Amino acid sequence: KITGSANISTDVNTHTYLSLSDNSTWDIKADSTVSNLTVDNSTVYISRADGRDVEPTRLTITENYVGNNGVLHLRTELGDDNSATDKVVINGNTSGTTRVKVTNAGGSGAYTLNGIEIISVEGESNGEFIKDSRIFAGAYEYSLTRGNTEATNKNWYLTNFLATSGGETNSGGSSAPTVAPTPVLRLEAGSYVANLAAANTLFVMRLNDRAGEMR
């Protein structure tokens, strides 16, 4: 158990029960494994490399994870579903609430179909993982969401589309066509389009404007 604003750093696998509390920090330097992990008002850095490119680090929890206002920091090359990313793999159950902070590792943004999987859960997935701050790259704004199918709803993904319900079934029993999800663009994208439109029309004048006011 690590308490009292302690800081630990590991670069080898660790097979143990680890409990962080009282603003403690665990700085992971390489792929690591623990049996159980509790993050209580503390922070875990899955990786904190200085370079722009991500070298994915994996934290494996062979049993259970508990979050109590904990924070997980991950680095992801924000792009499409196949983007390189740090990852947390939990073979057991999750509980509590954890904030997740994602740092972009040089990604330029791309549309995601299913999302970038950053947290995988095998057991009961009762824990909630909440985006700590904005996550964006290129024109896209990313959210942290559960998977939207029965096979993936225990896991957590970085997505940049609006969630839609499945195809509706009509009275004849057939399903309506599936509507493609709508991409979520950065707030700044709207301002860019508006500024571009204004720039393109700024010096477009009517004849009366060019001739001046008639006296």
What is the predicted function of each stretch?
Residues 33, 108, 155-157, 161-184:
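Flexible, glycine-rich linker and terminal segments associated
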Residues 168-215:
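Outer membrane beta-barrel translocator domains of Type V secretion systems
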Residues 1-93, 97, 103-104, 108-160:
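Extracellular beta-solenoid/beta-roll
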